[in-house]
């Protein structure tokens, strides 16, 4: 019965979209899992004639399993040497060759006729610029504070592969870093291991990649300074409808059911600014100051300063608007 249901789902996806690319570049949204990426994808997908591919390398999903391109998380790692295959798969998706990978017909922002795509991807950190060039895409890189991101996650499926990666040890880490990382991996708490995973998943992008033509967006600025940030998105990505993006900012993501009860309670608050501030700061009541300090010790181990102790928004160089820090400091 399950197989039959999956087959019907694949059939509906295959028949539910006609895609012909015209003009503007497709958007490749890279982010860490539970960092607001579904919400961000839906904000971008609110635009006319857009469709989306939601985690086309997530091996837990039946359509990804059916595609058969990858079967294990390690195949997304640089050590596997599968880069050309993975990029070719993205190119095939651009050409609508795996039609069963299309969005489900009854999901939010589904459209029968489309001409532009947003891809949401939680891996391929080492291939972002190759994806940009090979797929002629625009890169959006979404950041969220490592503590709430980690607290929202239940598993870190690629952490073991990161720690064992010869590619990372050779290109991005020295012996002292590798030794300390292994100590945390083997003897740290789940929280510390989650921060470790966040650092690995963002290290290349924040320290080593050529990012001059990427668009960095932080979850906190998009939420707290929504209108200005949506206008920045529209300008940089050639998006015509700022109004639909602003509306999407205030609409919970389709995966809201994965959120904890405290988040669901916050979303019921009718005061928009109070609600947004609570979403950005609620994690501070869930950890000790010692844990927060330990988080930033791990970031320092990787040479990362994008977020700092006792500050809820990213470093100024990752923000687009001067008043975001002031907004973040004003409790509603």
Description of each model-found segment:
Residues 1-27, 178-192, 199-202, 206-212, ...:
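PAPS-dependent sulfotransferases, especially Golgi type II membrane carbohydrate sulfotransferases
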Residues 1-103, 159, 331:
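PAPS-dependent sulfotransferase catalytic core
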Residues 27, 51, 138-141, 215-217:
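Hydrophobic/aromatic beta-strand patches that form the interior of the parallel beta-sheet core
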Residues 30-32, 119-122, 143-144, 219-220:
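Short His-Asn-centered micro-motif
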Residues 36-50, 131-134, 153-154, 216-241, ...:
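PAPS/PAP-binding and catalytic site of the sulfotransferase fold
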Residues 99-127:
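Glycine-rich phosphate-binding loop used to anchor ATP phosphates in small-molecule kinases
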Residues 120-121, 134-154:
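Conserved phosphate-donor/acceptor-positioning beta-strand/loop module used by diverse small-molecule
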Residues 159-183:
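Long, charge-dense
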